[in-house]
């Protein structure tokens, strides 16, 4: 990092950021300006500063690191950058007015992490790349939590966002399970997929009950449905006799649990949230 190229890019990025802050501090002056008006130049300067600083560090990682360590550092830095920007821009770009960019950035964070893990582009037994990817996962989780909290606090409970958040969280959970199994030397993900989905389904159901959220309970049942379909359509026919017996036992247990939930809790499962809070 101690080179002229890095220092120059870093200075340009910080200077651009400083100019954007000055525009915000003297907003009335720049609002009346002929050329450098506050709108849209303040937003452009902020985004340009973020892009320059991001490129500055990514270029250094590409130049001085190699292999799985380089891709891991780039992944962790990207995940951290998206989270930091979501937090740093909360006042300048309120989530009420810029909902789509926040939700898009949240989805991109999960997608970038998933592409890196599922791409099998790293050495599973190497400690440093593995730790970097777990750091990346931590930043992605923090990003999901922060944006979700801001959304629910400032905008309120909206079914489309809850569904979107659960899809991202489920995809992230499966990817983290895949990463853990790869680090443990397990290439096959069939069993891990089913177990991970089952755990996610139980968590969704528990949260749906505790938070009185009908949509979460329905999503949980959909998750269990995916597990059942996979067991019936794929796992059952690809296994030997003993494996089929185990699958039938698992199917029986899942169906028994779902039957119990429906018979004992059907009024709670499908009751409207408004009725539950009355």
Regions found by a protein language model. Give the residues of each.
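Alpha-helical transmembrane segments of multi-pass membrane proteins
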Residues: 1-278
């Amino acid at each position: 990092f101690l080179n002229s190229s890095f220092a120059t890019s870093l200075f340009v990025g910080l200077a651009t950021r400083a100019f954007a802050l000055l525009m915000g501090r003297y907003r009335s002056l720049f609002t009346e300006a002929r050329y450098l008006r506050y709108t849209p130049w303040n937003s452009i300067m902020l985004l340009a500063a973020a892009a320059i600083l991001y490129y500055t560090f990514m270029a250094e990682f590409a130049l001085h690191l190699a292999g799985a360590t380089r891709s891991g550092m780039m992944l962790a830095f990207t995940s951290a950058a998206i989270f930091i920007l979501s937090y740093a821009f909360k006042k300048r770009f309120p989530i009420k007015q810029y909902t789509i960019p926040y939700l898009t950035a949240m989805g991109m964070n999960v997608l970038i992490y998933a592409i890196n893990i599922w791409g099998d582009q790293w050495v599973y037994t190497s400690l440093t790349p593995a730790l970097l990817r777990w750091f990346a996962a931590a930043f992605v989780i923090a990003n999901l939590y922060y944006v979700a909290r801001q959304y629910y606090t400032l905008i309120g409970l909206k079914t489309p966002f809850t569904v979107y958040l659960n899809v991202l969280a489920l995809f992230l959970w499966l990817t983290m399970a895949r990463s853990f199994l790869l680090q443990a030397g397990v290439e096959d993900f069939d069993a891990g997929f089913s177990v991970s989905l089952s755990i996610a389904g139980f968590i969704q159901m528990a949260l749906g009950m505790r938070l009185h959220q009908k949509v979460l309970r329905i999503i949980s049942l959909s998750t269990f449905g995916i597990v059942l379909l996979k067991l019936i359509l794929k796992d059952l026919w690809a296994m030997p006799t003993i494996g089929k017996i185990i699958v039938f036992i698992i199917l029986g247990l899942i169906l028994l649990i779902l039957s119990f939930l429906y018979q004992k809790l059907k009024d709670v499962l499908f009751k409207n949230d408004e009725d539950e809070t009355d």
